[in-house]
């Protein structure tokens, strides 16, 4: 059997006997020093230190190699770099491909810390960044400069959930700037609902903190690269001291085993709740990529194989501070917290001017309070009842 279905891949990826040593899961190998029995063994390890050979703890142990192999199998990459969090994955992946005088082109709906890294850190190092509308499509060529080295996508966009026309964007970039490295924050799709490298994207980045871990109790970042970019990414990450502890690598691998079934439930529940919200009189708009009418829905339908549980909706009015507190402080099932991707439902709200402030060279087209929710694994009926009670508090 060569063409395995996703669930089968998730259960088995990275579980070869060299990593499990007779157990079901990969072993947890914690190490800094790794011992060589002979001079020849040390020479062999040195020659193969970048190819899954035990050399030094910062290069990885069996636990890391198991996860890296699994991620490459799932996303179709030549190699996978591991980082202590998603922000580290984004920052170090971008940094690997730019130098003084270069230009980055980034969607203006990218995660705010990704924007800040470019403007506040790389800006001081002589790297410039400009921004494009997430729905720009082939017109992205208008923003490409002779020194554009990185094109950074995030689809769906952070908070407002716009989906790119990725084939049009990639084709346009390849035509005008064939050497530019195209990378994507692929966290919403968990790297498996959108197969970025199959769309000629060079690097797929995830905050594995979200769906890969799946329980809101650890942080990890991954970057899966194609053959063109893997060696440069790998060595830059190593030289920057980027690494992941063995225990978190193990927890990430363990999270993969249930990722398929969790994502299906997140999708089913979030779509039911999104449809309920779309018909609620206090809701002006629902931003759910899998919901008809959401920005870029046709692109999601064409390019993605499913949906996760994160989306947002806009209220008919802008809540006052008192209303905001009454609304958010009294949910019984929705917890107010950043991040997402765990088994629990989360909620957080932003005023339109707050979103506009993190949309460089853009703005917002709504005036009501925006509410972002992550739909967890609780009963849909119970979650709807909790949301209904929230609406009753702000009538």
Swiss-Prot record:
In terms of Pfam families, this protein maps to: Cys_Met_Meta_PP
Residues modified as N6-(pyridoxal phosphate)lysine are: 210
- Keyword Metal-binding, does the record have it? no
Q: Where is the signal peptide?
A: none
Checking InterPro entries in the record gives: Cys/Met-Metab_PyrdxlP-dep_enz, Cys_b_lyase_bac, Cys_met_metab_PP, PyrdxlP-dep_Trfase, PyrdxlP-dep_Trfase_major, PyrdxlP-dep_Trfase_small
GO CC annotations? cytoplasm
Q: In which pathway does it act?
A: Amino-acid biosynthesis; L-methionine biosynthesis via de novo pathway; L-homocysteine from L-cystathionine: step 1/1
- Names of the cofactor(s): pyridoxal 5'-phosphate
Record keywords, A-Z: Amino-acid biosynthesis, Cytoplasm, Lyase, Methionine biosynthesis, Pyridoxal phosphate
> Does this entry carry the keyword Amino-acid biosynthesis?
yes
What GO terms describe the biological role, i.e. biological process, of this protein? L-cysteine catabolic process to pyruvate; methionine biosynthetic process; transsulfuration
An example molecular function term from Gene Ontology annotations: cysteine-S-conjugate beta-lyase activity
Q: Where in the cell is it found?
A: Cytoplasm
Q: Which reaction does it catalyse?
A: L,L-cystathionine + H2O = L-homocysteine + pyruvate + NH4(+); an S-substituted L-cysteine + H2O = a thiol + pyruvate + NH4(+)
Question: What are its E.C. numbers?
Answer: 4.4.1.13
Name the job this protein performs: Catalyzes the cleavage of cystathionine to homocysteine, pyruvate and ammonia during methionine biosynthesis.
Identify its protein family: Belongs to the trans-sulfuration enzymes family.
Oligomer and partners: Homotetramer.
UniProt protein name: Cystathionine beta-lyase
Source species taxonomy: Bacteria, Pseudomonadati, Pseudomonadota, Gammaproteobacteria, Enterobacterales
């Amino acid at each position: 059997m060569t063409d395995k279905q996703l669930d089968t891949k998730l259960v088995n990826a990275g579980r070869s006997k060299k990593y499990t040593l007779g157990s079901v899961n990969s072993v947890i190998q914690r190490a800094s020093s790794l011992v060589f029995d002979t001079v020849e063994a040390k020479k062999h390890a040195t020659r193969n230190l970048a190819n899954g050979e035990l050399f030094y703890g910062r290069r990885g142990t069996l636990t890391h190699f198991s996860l890296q192999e699994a991620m490459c199998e799932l996303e179709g990459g030549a190699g996978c770099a591991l980082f202590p969090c998603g922000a580290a994955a984004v920052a170090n992946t971008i940094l690997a491909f730019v130098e003084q005088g270069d230009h980055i082109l980034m969607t203006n709906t990218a995660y705010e810390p990704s924007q800040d890294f470019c403007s506040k850190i790389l800006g001081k190092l002589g790297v410039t960044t400009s921004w494009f509308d997430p729905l720009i499509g082939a017109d992205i060529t208008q923003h490409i400069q002779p020194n554009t080295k990185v094109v950074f996508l995030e689809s769906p966009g952070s908070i407002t959930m716009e989906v790119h026309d990725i084939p049009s964007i990639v084709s346009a970039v390849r035509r005008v700037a064939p050497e530019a490295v195209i990378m994507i924050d692929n966290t919403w799709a968990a790297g498996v609902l959108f197969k970025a490298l199959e769309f000629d994207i060079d690097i797929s980045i995830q905050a594995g903190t979200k769906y890969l871990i799946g329980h809101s109790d650890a942080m990890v970042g991954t970057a899966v690269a194609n053959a063109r970019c893997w060696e440069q990414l790998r060595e830059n990450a190593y030289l920057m001291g980027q690494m992941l502890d063995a225990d978190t690598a193990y927890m990430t691998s363990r999270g993969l085993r249930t990722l398929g079934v969790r994502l299906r439930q997140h999708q089913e529940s979030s779509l039911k709740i999104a449809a309920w919200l779309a018909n609620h009189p206090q809701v002006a708009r629902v931003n759910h990529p899998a919901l008809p009418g959401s920005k870029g829905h046709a692109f999601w339908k064409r390019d993605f194989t499913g949906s996760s549980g994160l989306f947002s909706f806009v209220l008919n009015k802008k809540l006052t501070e008192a209303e905001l507190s009454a609304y958010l402080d009294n949910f019984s099932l929705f917890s107010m917290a950043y991040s997402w991707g765990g088994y629990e439902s989360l909620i957080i709200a932003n005023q339109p001017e707050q979103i506009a402030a993190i949309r460089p060279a853009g703005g917002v087209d709504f005036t009501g309070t925006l509410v972002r929710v992550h739909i967890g694994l609780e009963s849909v009926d119970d979650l709807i009842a909790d949301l209904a009670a929230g609406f009753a508090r702000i009538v």
